[in-house]
Structures are given as C-alpha cells and as structure tokens.
C-alpha cells in the first residue's frame, strides 16, 4: 500500500499535479530538506511551486524500501533551470543548465497519507 502511494506521489510530482500531491499529504505534513523545514500542506505546496517554477524538476525513484509506516527512497533528481539562477544551493545556473542530485527521501505515513518527508543528499 505505502509503495503504491509513493509511486503515486512521484507521478503527481513529475506531472505538476499539485492537487494530486495535496491529496496524498496529511494536512500537517512536515517537509525537511536543504530549504529548511516547512510544516503543513500549504507550506509544502508553496515549496513545490517554487521548485517547479525555477526548474523542470524530474524526480525518479531508483530504489524503494518499505518498513511499516516508513518508506525510504533513493532518488535521481534532474533539475533543469528555466531561467538564469544566481544562487541555488551555492551554485549559479544558466537557463537550460541541468543539475543532477542523488537524494534519499524518507517518508512517514499516518492514516494513509504522507505525514513527514525528509530529503537528504547522498554522496
């Protein structure tokens, strides 16, 4: 069940389906990432819209490990700048330039929805 929800999450994320994402998230979802900690569905969606406004952002789950209510995902994240970006995570990018990140996402589920997301870089 949780693997199905994770696959739906990535499908919605990559399809720019904010409503689909919202339906998968708990109202008080917590997102912890390089951009800090956001709490609540609206805060998550604001971060999502910021990222997808700056980049064509395609996240591909490479490995999915389910352990009860926690799912750990190894992610290949391809970010292509839509315009020149002076500073993103300490880097400047020109329009059309791609940044590839290897990430780990840890997703915690509660009542059939994603309640916590922690995204960390992999070496």
Task: Identify the role of each PLM range.
Residues 9, 20-21, 29, 40, ...:
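Hydrophobic pocket/interface hotspot
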Residues 1, 49-123:
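A beta-strand edge to alpha-helix "cap/lid" segment located at domain peripheries
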Residues 1-16:
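Short, aromatic-enriched amphipathic alpha-helices that serve as compact interaction elements
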Residues 15-16, 23, 37, 43, ...:
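Short, flexible segments with low predicted structural confidence
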Residues 28-39, 51-54:
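A short gly/proline-enriched turn/hairpin at secondary-structure junctions
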Residues 10, 33-36, 63-65:
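Structured beta->alpha junctions
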Residues 5, 17-28, 32:
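Short, well-ordered alpha-helical segments enriched in acidic and aromatic residues
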Residues 12, 20, 54:
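Short alpha-helical functional segments enriched in proximate histidine and acidic residues
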